[in-house]
Amino acid sequence: MSSVKYDAIIIGAGVIGPTIATAFARQGRKVLIVERDWSKPDRIVGELMQPAGIKALRELGMIKAINNIRAVDCTGYYIKYYDETITIPYPLKKDACITNPVKPVPDAVDGVNDKLDSDSTLNVDDWDFDERVRGAAFHHGDFLMNLRQICRDEPNVTAVEATVTKILRDPSDPNTVIGVQTKQPSGTVDYHAKLTISCDGIYSKFRKELSPTNVPTIGSYFIGLYLKNAELPAKGKGHVLLGGHAPALIYSVSPTETRVLCVYVSSKPPSAANDAVYKYLRDNILPAIPKETVPAFKEALEERKFRIMPNQYLSAMKQGSENHKGFILLGDSLNMRHPLTGGGMTVGLNDSVLLAKLLHPKFVEDFDDHQLIAKRLKTFHRKRKNLDAVINTLSISLYSLFAADKKPLRILRNGCFKYFQRGGECVNGPIGLLSGMLPFPMLLFNHFFSVAFYSVYLNFIERGLLGFPLALFEAFEVLFTAIVIFTPYLWNEIVR
């Protein structure tokens, strides 16, 4: 057993673990971070970061994690709906500075670590003089290794490679978590801390510590593949392909490599037998690929190097209860959404920012003060909902809208794209929500139902006078469908 008692133990060194560990360490806390495998991971998600995620990295003083990994700028979205296309830029900085300004974590920023450097692929002047906010795309593993190195460079951080097998509770008070038990080559080692934070990701072993029913649902899968030297219709944009097929995403992760993620609608993964994945991509996705990108897609298709990952949803539970003192969930172990909108890292990083601010020593002098931490966690749960509810509800609603093929959904899809084509606030609002720079749930509510009513209006126009009775019936179908695919998720995110 380790004789050292830490202020905080962080379980997991994915994207979120190193950020909260670094923030605590810079605030003077003694932190232990435990990771099962410190080698570079190879994942097909966590490669596209929205502008609100970039903002969070600045607030944490960890923006340089996107440097020197051949990251590429992301300046907005290119949407292809059947044979129609529209390009949507990210919000203007002058607007973003009002709706979601940069507010550094106290003691985490030194005036240098919140500044991006120029490197072989990123130009600081391009970022600084662009009138709009930017996101970035990169290889997940390279980005993660930079985050980990920044974390390990902190004098107050101790990094250990081990598997956490058990959450330790106080024998005299089982409601209080006092540390973790780990399995190492030398045997079992226990570590103790005043506060334990689990950031062990989508397959979290410890989220059930809060409740045995705290489990995610799987509604679909992503099939991922890499394209080499692909030509895309809009450089520097995330590409979303919509139409008579499940949605697909295309975005560059380096100057020469492009990621494609294709939704497979099923609660079970696609079969690896009989070339089922190959045939699915060839028959359903290939016809929708932009013509410039087809050669590279065909080449990747023939290589048959497919990666499959579940798309999971889990709303965040309230934390700080009397029977879980000294224990916090953070990141994907707490909360997940459909990755269609690329908002996972954005939500997690902003949670790190918020928690580091709320637990700063000027508010919580000692992590042993469980009663005070419980109060701060209630504030955390309430304040995180603005961004969390927007990103999570938007992701699952867009997936539900574009992944199924019922008549009301087809009417809504058509109305949604036509709504974007109107321009102005019909596109500025939605991209502000998607980017995380407009974290306002009621704005999402307004735009979603504006789309619904506009869809009904367009359908009346298309049906004409003779088709009025049918259009009237379809109007009720469309509005009912809109309520069903949107309201329960928004309610769950806001109220739970």
From Swiss-Prot:
Subcellular location, record wording: Microsome membrane; Endoplasmic reticulum membrane
Amino-acid positions noted as binding FAD in the UniProt annotation, renumbered to this chain: V15, I16, E35, R36, R43, R148, V164, D332, M345
Pfam family, one: SE
Membrane topology reported for the UniProt record: Multi-pass membrane protein
Molecular-function GO terms, alphabetical: flavin adenine dinucleotide binding; squalene monooxygenase activity
E.C. code: 1.14.14.17
Key words of the record: Endoplasmic reticulum, FAD, Flavoprotein, Membrane, Microsome, Oxidoreductase, Transmembrane, Transmembrane helix
Pathway listed: Terpene metabolism; lanosterol biosynthesis; lanosterol from farnesyl diphosphate: step 2/3
Ways its activity is controlled: Activity is completely abolished by Triton X-100, deoxycholate or Cu(2+), and partially inhibited by thiol reagents, rotenone and antimycin A. The allylamine antimycotic agents naftifine and SF 86-327are potent inhibitors and show apparently non-competitive kinetics with respect to the substrate squalene.
Transmembrane segments: 4-24, 431-451, 466-486
Observed effect of gene inactivation: Impairs ergosterol production and leads to increased susceptibility to terbinafine. Also leads to susceptibility to polyenes, nystatin and amphotericin B. Impairs the localization of the membrane-bound transporter CDR1. Reduces the formation of hyphae.
UniProt-listed InterPro entries: FAD/NAD-bd_sf, Squalene_epoxidase, Squalene_monox
Necessary cofactors: FAD
Family recorded in the similarity comment: Belongs to the squalene monooxygenase family.
Descriptive protein name: Squalene epoxidase ERG1
Primary gene name: ERG1
